[in-house]
Design a protein with these regions (language model features):
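Consensus "Asn ladder" position of solenoid repeat domains
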Residues: 217, 243, 266, 295, ...
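N-terminal Sec-pathway targeting helices
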Residues: 2-15
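Parallel beta-helix/beta-solenoid
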Residues: 69, 89-91, 93-95, 110-111, 118-158, 171, 207-222, 232-247, ...
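N-terminal extracellular ligand-recognition/capping segment immediately after the signal peptide
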Residues: 49, 59, 70-112, 156-172, ...
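Right-handed parallel beta-helix/beta-solenoid
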Residues: 30-61
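Autoprocessing Asn-cyclization modules and mimics
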Residues: 101-179, 185-188, 193
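Short glycine/acidic-rich loop motifs that flank beta-strands on beta-rich extracellular proteins
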Residues: 83-85, 104-111, 222-229, 249-256, ...
Length: 453
């Protein structure tokens, strides 16, 4: 009797085991047939039905390819016609098949962006303890869900010091290097003083580590449109090389709070008109450590601009060229390069500018302008407006077709900071070296400049 009872139990256990086994096998097969394969080896849009002929829409095929892999290779010389923005939400590399040959074209036929990189936050919390400048960590209310490598964006409820427009605030962007309880260590020291004990509120939002690489690709509209072509959000160490952007009148590339983006050997021609108040070739909006180099900007209101709802910091533009129209052709404030409002520790060096109202516009703190060349029809080399610590040295203005500057620098009444201009050469000047309306400068030093009327 006992043996019979034992056999029944063994039979029952075996039945349950095989039932569960076959159920899992069937479930796996069913899920496998419905799931999307994600490729880590190179894939092409043609695998997903794209033609690349510029006649039929390739939007769906491109989007499927983007969703399916981390390395997308476009055909050299192909034109991929799209009617919606391509959306990216994971790390990816997109490049034309042959680096030094004709780039693939992504042609956006509609009045919309061509590409949007999205990176949704993983955590939103608050700063719990006062932060002082040059601090290596911050203490948060919670760190649940955060990881090493995440970006951390701090945003205060206290307005920025200059030209805050009632919504631009103190804040900064960081990368997390260590998490110890509620203490988060940062890759670079903090910039600001946040007085939490005195009632200042600072939100802390974490974004996962995501990377974007774009190589040898042209993004276009058939004709100029009031759009921003590429919208890049919260990336880490993104790289863009050999990119061209054509006919997006508002902005070519928006870098929204990106960490250490590197843009090189790229070309932007927007077709910007006088009604456009932005017209930025590249706009660094609240980023940190972004570098734009060896790139060319045409038909823009400003080649590169640094700003943000919280400050853009430690950005550089070097060895780049900006070609504008004669003065007063575009909207007020047009310049080869510049900053406005929320920008700190920005360097412009070894650049070439033609025309524009100004070679540089500065509205920020610790703005350095060195060894740049301006030619053509402009009002002044530099126009300051709000901020502090503007330093201009070793630059040159050269006359072209009889052109002359009205002034080398304009310092308006709203600028009360420090201003330094040394060792600059001006070949063609009709007015005084500096037009100064501000009567309350903290410091001014002007010396060793060379002027030819």
């Amino acid at each position: 009797m006992k043996n019979l009872y034992k056999k029944k139990w063994i039979y029952l256990v075996l039945c349950i085991f095989f039932s569960v086994f076959f159920f899992n096998v069937l479930n796996h097969l069913r899920n496998s047939s419905n799931s999307k394969t994600f490729y880590y080896t190179p894939i092409t849009p043609e695998q997903f039905g794209a033609t690349g002929l510029g006649k039929e829409l390739d939007t769906e095929a491109l989007q499927k390819a983007i969703n399916s892999g981390s390395h997308l290779v476009l055909k050299s010389g192909a034109t991929y016609l799209i009617d919606k923005p391509l959306i990216i939400n994971h790390s990816i590399k997109i490049e034309t098949s042959k680096k030094n040959e004709k780039p693939a074209i992504i042609l956006q036929k509609n009045k919309d962006s061509a590409l949007i990189f999205k990176n949704d936050p993983v955590k939103s919390t608050y700063v719990k303890q006062t932060i002082t400048p040059n601090q290596s960590y911050v203490v948060l209310e919670s760190t649940e869900g955060m990881k090493i490598g995440d970006l951390l964006h701090l945003k205060s409820d206290k307005l920025w010091y200059w030209d805050n427009r009632h919504y631009l605030t103190k804040g900064e962007l960081h990368k997390i290097t260590k998490i110890q309880g509620n203490k988060v260590y940062l890759e670079s020291p903090t910039s600001e003083y946040y007085k939490i004990k005195e009632g200042e509120k600072v939100t802390a939002i974490a974004y996962p580590e995501r990377n974007l690489e774009l190589y040898n690709i042209s993004f276009k509209h058939p004709k100029p449109q009031n759009t921003t072509m590429l919208k890049i959000n919260y990336t880490s160490n993104a790289r863009m090389e050999g990119i061209s952007v054509i006919n997006s009148k508002m902005a070519g590339v928006l870098l929204n709070k990106t960490f250490h983006t590197y843009v090189s050997n790229s070309y932007v021609e927007l077709g910007t008109t006088k009604d456009i108040k932005t017209g930025y070739g590249i706009q660094d909006y609240g980023g940190i450590g972004n570098v734009i180099t060896t790139s060319t900007f045409k038909k823009v209101r400003r080649g590169v601009d640094f700003s943000g709802d919280t400050p853009s910091r430690y950005g550089t533009v070097s060895y780049s060229k900006a070609f504008g129209y004669k003065k007063d052709t575009l909207a007020v404030g047009n310049s080869g390069f510049g900053t406005h409002s929320t920008a700190e520790h920005i360097l412009f060096e070894n650049n070439y500018i033609e025309n524009f109202n100004y070679a540089f516009v500065t509205r920020g703190n610790h703005i350095s302008i060195r060894n740049n060349i301006l030619k053509g029809f402009s009002r002044s080399f530099v126009a300051t407006s709000y901020g502090d610590n503007v330093k201009i040295w070793d630059n040159m203005y050269e006359s072209k077709n009889g052109s002359k500057l009205d002034y080398f620098a304009i310092i308006p009444r709203q600028y009360h900071g420090a201003f330094t201009a040394t060792d600059n050469t001006i070949n063609g000047l009709t007015g005084p070296f500096i037009k100064r309306n501000s009567k309350d400068l903290r410091y001014i030093h002007v010396s060793s400049n060379h002027t030819i009327p």
